[in-house]
From Swiss-Prot:
GO cellular component: chloroplast; mitochondrion; small ribosomal subunit
Ranges annotated as spanning the membrane: none
Highest rank taxon of the organism: Eukaryota
Organismal lineage: Eukaryota, Viridiplantae, Streptophyta, Zygnematophyceae, Zygnematophycidae
SUPFAM superfamilies: Ribosomal protein S16 (SSF54565)
Keywords of this entry: Chloroplast, Plastid, Ribonucleoprotein, Ribosomal protein
A Pfam cross-reference name: Ribosomal_S16
Subcellular location: Plastid, Chloroplast
Protein name: Small ribosomal subunit protein bS16c
UniProt family annotation: Belongs to the bacterial ribosomal protein bS16 family.
GO MF terms held by the record: structural constituent of ribosome
InterPro entries in the record: Ribosomal_bS16 (IPR000307), Ribosomal_bS16_CS (IPR020592), Ribosomal_bS16_dom_sf (IPR023803)
PANTHER family in the record: 30S RIBOSOMAL PROTEIN S16, SMALL RIBOSOMAL SUBUNIT PROTEIN BS16M
Chief localization: plastid
Length: 79
């Protein structure tokens, strides 16, 4: 099963995240199947590849709770 989850990047105390599609059996920072976005919680910036996200969701990918909250704030589920 494929999930949309956050992959941590950045320095100590300054996290940034990439939103990735990854198999559930892989670790958090493992090899991603596809990178579909970027999230910076300190600057509250989000960059999303909406067509790729919608395609993955149609093919059965499940977002984690945090990623689904980010997608709702960006208005992806309204499209």
């Amino acid at each position: 099963m494929v999930k949309l989850r956050l992959k941590r990047y950045g320095r100590k105390q300054q996290p940034t995240y990439r939103i990735i599609a990854i198999d559930v059996r892989c670790r958090r920072d493992g090899k991603a199947l596809k990178e579909v976005g970027f999230y910076d919680p300190l600057k509250d910036k989000t960059q999303l590849n909406v067509p790729a996200i919608l395609t993955l969701l149609q093919h059965g990918a499940q977002p984690t709770d945090t990623v689904s909250h980010i997608l709702q704030k960006a208005g992806v589920f309204e499209k």
